[in-house]
């Protein structure tokens, strides 16, 4: 007969459920330089203490689970657990807190944005004790930032490649975004580039559809680029969207672009995924291609004030994963974006070192050390009357994208492009002369209209067009 065995609780293990805060709420914790820090906007369910909710967020996004497990004794929780180290009530909101959580560096795979976000936001957002949860900001430690390649080239290298300095770059998204044949698409690209724009762009959902297969588009666009370069004497580019159903197909499209000799390609980094984007960024670094990033799907994640992730977090993820351009909103156009908040994450994209500034939504000081900067792209419902504000808000290191604001010109694409180029150069000259664009921008544009019929026609078409709605995502 087999001997009877008796199960006893060991000295280091007691089965059952205990409050998260007993292990994961540590207000006395001293944050380490190597820690990854997160700021969550947290709304507990009625009756749930904020300390318990903050601890639950730390636990469920690191080492914890709903009950005590005996395998806790096989590792060091003090070394690996996340810690909620501070709770801050949100002013003007009832039962809402900013929970600050510190994660040890060893929890994350080096150079993997996918692993970082799988851990921090992968599971905890569905936790029943929380009514809502939003990741407002992350502090990426220097030690972790150094494990990423980041953008393939960065702002300075891009300007050297294009030989364009002292002004914002100008672009245009080809419209209609779907339905054009490859030949007509290439014709639209050529007209915009010869008119004075630096770039044209595939829209985010232009991949390889029956009406225009990707290889046909690439060939006609390359022809348009070379023809416009020969006519203008300037380097031109088109963001050829390499986003595809598989990583293999994506890299095949990138290789085709490289062989055609075009300067830049494009990727939808949220719908395509961080792993695919990082792979493409490495390919672009190795083969001399610039990488334009579209943020399609971002508003599903970031638009609601109480739940999801703020775009500043998505922007940081892109700087780590890799991209030379990133759409960032316009402040003045048709898409959501408060001025101070937008400028906060634009600085996080471009600058090497950014101080904590709660007035702009920046919860942590961020040091990017070796990672190149990302050029913000202002796109969505902008036209020539917006140019003074755009130059004043974004400065030189930005790409201003006028889709309808180019193709909607009453005289055609090339005059529309010329109108935007003239408006941009007039605003830059006025700024360099010391004029205040926020106050005098309208006068600057009207003065330029006197010698530019293309600009005058554009100003007449869009003189009454405004997008004035209350911003949803405010500080």
From Swiss-Prot:
Q: EC? A: 4.1.1.39
- The active site consists of 175, 294
Residue positions binding substrate: 123, 173, 177, 295, 327, 379
Query: Which cofactors does the annotated protein need, by name?
Result: Mg(2+)
Where in this protein does the record say N-acetylproline is found? 3
Q: Which residues carry this modification: N6,N6,N6-trimethyllysine?
A: 14
Q: Which NCBIfam families match?
A: PRK04208.1 (NF003252)
Name of the featured protein:
Ribulose bisphosphate carboxylase large chain
Organism, as annotated: Bryopsis maxima
């Amino acid at each position: 007969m087999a001997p009877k065995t008796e199960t006893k609780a060991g000295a280091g293990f007691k089965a059952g459920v205990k409050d998260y805060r007993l292990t994961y709420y540590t207000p006395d914790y001293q944050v380490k330089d190597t820690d990854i820090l997160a700021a969550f906007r947290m709304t507990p369910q009625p009756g749930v203490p904020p300390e318990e909710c903050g601890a639950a967020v730390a636990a469920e996004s690191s080492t914890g689970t709903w009950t005590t497990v005996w395998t806790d004794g096989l590792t060091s929780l003090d070394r690996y657990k996340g810690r909620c180290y501070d709770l801050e009530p949100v002013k003007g909101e009832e039962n809402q807190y900013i929970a600050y959580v510190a994660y040890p560096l060893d929890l994350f795979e080096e150079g993997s944005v996918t692993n970082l976000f799988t851990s921090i936001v992968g599971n905890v957002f569905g936790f029943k004790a929380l009514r809502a949860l939003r990741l407002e900001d992350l502090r990426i430690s220097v030690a972790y930032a150094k494990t990423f390649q980041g953008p393939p080239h960065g702002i300075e290298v891009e300007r050297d490649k294009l030989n364009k300095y002292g002004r914002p770059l100008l672009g245009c998204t080809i419209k209609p975004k779907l339905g054009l044949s490859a030949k007509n698409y290439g014709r639209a690209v050529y007209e915009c580039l010869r008119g004075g724009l630096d770039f044209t762009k595939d829209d985010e959902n232009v991949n390889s559809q029956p009406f225009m297969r990707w290889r046909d588009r690439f060939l006609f666009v390359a022809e348009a680029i070379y023809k416009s370069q020969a006519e203008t004497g300037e380097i031109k580019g088109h963001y050829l969207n390499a986003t595809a159903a598989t990583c293999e197909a994506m890299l095949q499209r990138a290789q085709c672009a490289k062989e055609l000799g075009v300067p830049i390609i494009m990727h939808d980094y949220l719908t395509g995924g961080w792993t695919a984007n990082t792979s493409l960024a490495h390919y672009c670094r190795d083969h001399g291609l610039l990488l334009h990033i579209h943020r399609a799907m971002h508003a599903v994640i970031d638009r609601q004030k109480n739940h999801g992730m703020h775009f500043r977090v998505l922007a940081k993820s892109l700087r780590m994963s890799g991209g030379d351009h990133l759409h960032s909103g316009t402040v003045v156009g048709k898409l959501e974006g408060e001025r101070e908040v937008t400028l906060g994450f634009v600085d996080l994209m471009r600058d090497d070192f950014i101080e904590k500034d709660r007035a702009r939504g920046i919860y942590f000081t961020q040091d990017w050390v070796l990672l190149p900067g990302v050029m913000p792209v202002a796109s969505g419902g902008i036209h020539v009357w917006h140019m003074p504000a755009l130059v004043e808000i974004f400065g030189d290191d930005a790409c201003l994208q006028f889709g309808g604001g180019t193709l909607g010109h009453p005289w055609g694409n090339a005059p529309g492009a010329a109108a935007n180029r003239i408006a941009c150069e007039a605003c830059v000259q006025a700024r360099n002369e010391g004029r205040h664009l926020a106050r005098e921008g309208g006068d600057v544009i009207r003065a330029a209209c006197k010698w530019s019929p293309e600009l005058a026609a554009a100003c007449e078409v869009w003189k009454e067009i405004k997008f004035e709605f209350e911003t949803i995502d405010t500080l």
